[in-house]
Swiss-Prot record:
It is an enzyme of class 6 (ligase). This is CTP synthase. Pfam families: CTP_synth_N, GATase. Homotetramer. PANTHER family: CTP SYNTHASE, CTP SYNTHASE-RELATED. Residues 1-266 are annotated as: Amidoligase domain. Allosterically activated by GTP, when glutamine is the substrate; GTP has no effect on the reaction when ammonia is the substrate. The allosteric effector GTP functions by stabilizing the protein conformation that binds the tetrahedral intermediate(s) formed during glutamine hydrolysis. Inhibited by the product CTP, via allosteric rather than competitive inhibition. CTP binds at S14, D147, I148, E149, K187, T188, K189, P190, T191, Q192, K223. The lineage of its organism: Bacteria, Pseudomonadati, Pseudomonadota, Gammaproteobacteria, Enterobacterales. Keywords: ATP-binding, Glutamine amidotransferase, Ligase, Magnesium, Metal-binding, Nucleotide-binding, Pyrimidine biosynthesis. One of its GO terms (molecular function) is ATP binding. Mg(2+) binds at D72, E140. Residues 291-543 form the Glutamine amidotransferase type-1 domain. It comes from Blochmanniella pennsylvanica (strain BPEN). L-glutamine binds at G353, L381, G382, M383, Q384, E404, R471.
Length: 548
């Protein structure tokens, strides 16, 4: 099967939106009936982003097979139907580790190990393997052309021409065309210099995607075409839009998919973007709006909760409501109090996280939602703080806590997987080798829902598959005291020994999930839990307005 390769690089500045542009192009090609996948190459030395601070790097996106990957893979899954896996994200650290492992084994037979050919050959081998079974592979190279870290990756994609033929490769370069207010002009010089930098590496871009905050005129496109040696029809203008889900249509309207299909000699029907047109229609024709408070500790960088914020927007689209997300620092809840931080919300969501900082603010948020019948959705740590709060204030366990926060906790309602006991005080059979990542539960896990529960009603089925990323669990030894006080455990892992979902029946909508449903939400389908959560927020708003 012939595979065609599209390599996407970026220039001038970082954070131009290569990931979204790549995903949007993939969506248009997929809409033409092509089988498409995407690989992200990250130039940092970390093995994966799993241990990088969310404030520095953004969220860690978890794939079905449990890989901790770059947040761009979340964009890919939201735009195309192909599911990402561990081979869809490679870092420089992972590449170097593989090369060094082979060197220690003697695979190179005493050769001097160098960037060229050993590192570049490994990159090419992994790209070709990742493309297997697809019509088109798009490869996004992280970083900016000119960065020293990106050079091995750029050299590898330059060499791909000789590996798979020039007719099967295409280079797209994403650049910035800034508007200079003083002169009132868009400037093409940064794009020209960026292409010159790329040419010095040996790569002539076939297509330029020019980012700008306004429409790029015909004369400016001609100028870029002349100085960058790229055909005018291959100069794509990508101006700022109010919704990223409009970008597939923007690319199609400029004929980018036709140009690519012609270049690859692909005979396929016109792109059918009716799904995306429906998404945009509902997004632009809301019948109301609600405000959701998201209480977290990494709110200074919105990308730290990217999948959660997108899932809330998807649920808004499905309910035809605008979802206004108020980012609330959980430490502010502790310091400033509920009146100044949580008032005026239609729903409260506490997302996942690690560490003790800000936890008491999250517990206060769960308590406020429970006592005031405000819809509450706790994800991962958000479920755990809801359980701790209930244990302290309803189940008569004032010292309830997690061993993550208090090592010698007298009442450990949450504990490490290896510390958890069943209701008879016997350790649950988990060890460092039980799950991928040692004691970390990662990736898809089966969950069984109790019939008659709200969560079962929302999903409409008894068995679900959701993605996990955590190492602390509900301690079953203390669970009876909590459930006798009124909290329901309605979702369990495969062996029924790990709590996956909790509910508070004496509340309109109070759900906590140990898994991360946000990773399975897409703009076209949404996710049942998020859709139900926003529906509950709408109903709360209506009830609240009637009382006023």
């Amino acid at each position: 099967m012939r595979v065609n390769y599209i390599f996407v690089t970026g220039g001038v500045v970082s954070s131009l939106g290569k990931g979204i542009a790549t995903a949007s192009l993939a969506a248009v090609l997929e809409a033409r009936g092509l089988s498409v996948t995407i690989i992200k190459l990250d130039p940092y030395i970390n093995m994966d982003p799993g241990t990088i601070s969310p404030v520095q790097h953004g969220e860690v996106f978890i794939t079905e097979d449990g890989a901790e990957t770059d947040l761009d893979l979340g964009h890919y899954e939201r735009f195309i139907r192909t599911k990402m896996r561990h081979h869809n994200n490679f870092t420089a650290g992972k590449i170097y580790a593989d090369v060094l492992r082979k060197e220690r084994r003697g695979d190179y037979l005493g050769a001097t190990i160098q960037i060229i050919p050993h590192v570049t050959d490994t990159i090419k081998k992994w790209l070709i393997a990742g493309a297997f079974g697809h019509d088109v592979l798009l490869v996004e190279i992280g970083g900016t052309v000119g960065d020293i870290e990106s050079l091995p990756f750029l050299e590898a994609i330059r060499q791909m021409v000789m590996e798979v033929n020039r007719e099967q490769t295409l280079y797209i370069h994403l650049t910035l065309v800034p508007f200079i207010a003083v002169s009132g002009e868009l400037k093409t010089k940064p794009t020209q210099h960026s292409v010159k930098e790329l040419l010095s590496i040996g790569i002539q871009p076939d297509i330029l995607i020019c980012r700008s905050d306004r429409v790029i005129s015909n004369s400016e496109r001609k100028k870029i075409s002349l100085f960058c040696n790229v055909p005018k029809q291959a100069i794509i203008a990508l101006q700022d839009v109010d919704s990223i889900y409009k970008i597939p249509a923007l690319l199609k309207d400029q004929g980018l998919d036709n140009y690519i299909c012609k270049r690859f000699n692909l005979n396929c029907p016109e792109a059918n973007l009716s799904d995306w047109e429906e998404v945009i229609y509902y997004q632009e024709h809301p019948i109301g709006e609600v405000t959701v408070g998201m209480v977290g500790k990494y709110i200074e960088l919105v990308d730290a909760y990217k999948s959660v914020t997108e899932a809330l927007k998807h649920a808004g689209i499905k309910n035809r409501f605008i979802v206004n997300i108020r980012l609330i620092n959980s430490q502010d809840v502790e310091k400033l109090g509920i009146e100044k931080t949580l008032k005026g919300l239609d729903a409260i969501l506490v997302p996942g996280g690690f560490g003790y900082r800000g936890v008491e603010g999250k517990i206060l948020s769960a308590q406020y939602a429970r006592e005031n019948n405000i819809p509450y959705f706790g994800i991962c740590l958000g479920m755990q703080v809801a359980l701790i709060e209930f244990a302290r204030h309803v189940a008569g366990m004032p010292e309830a806590n997690s061993t993550e926060f208090v090592t010698n906790c007298k009442c450990p309602v949450i504990a490490l997987i290896t510390e958890c006991k069943d209701e008879n005080g016997i350790f649950i059979t988990h060890n460092d080798n039980t799950n991928l990542g040692g004691t970390m539960r990662l990736g898809n896990q089966a969950c069984y829902l109790i019939k008659g529960s709200l969560t079962h009603q929302i999903y409409g089925k008894s068995t679900i598959l959701e993605r996990h990323r955590h190492r602390y669990e509900v301690n079953n030894m203390l669970l009876k005291h909590i459930t006798h006080a009124g909290l329901s455990c309605v979702g369990f892992s495969k062996k029924n020994n790990l709590v996956e979902v909790i509910e508070y029946p004496n509340h309109p909508w109070f759900i906590g999930s140990q898994f991360h449903p946000e990773f399975n939400s897409t703009p076209r389908e949404g996710h049942p839990l998020f859709i139900g959560f926003i529906k509950a927020a709408i109903e709360y708003q209506h009830r609240h307005n009637k009382l006023i």
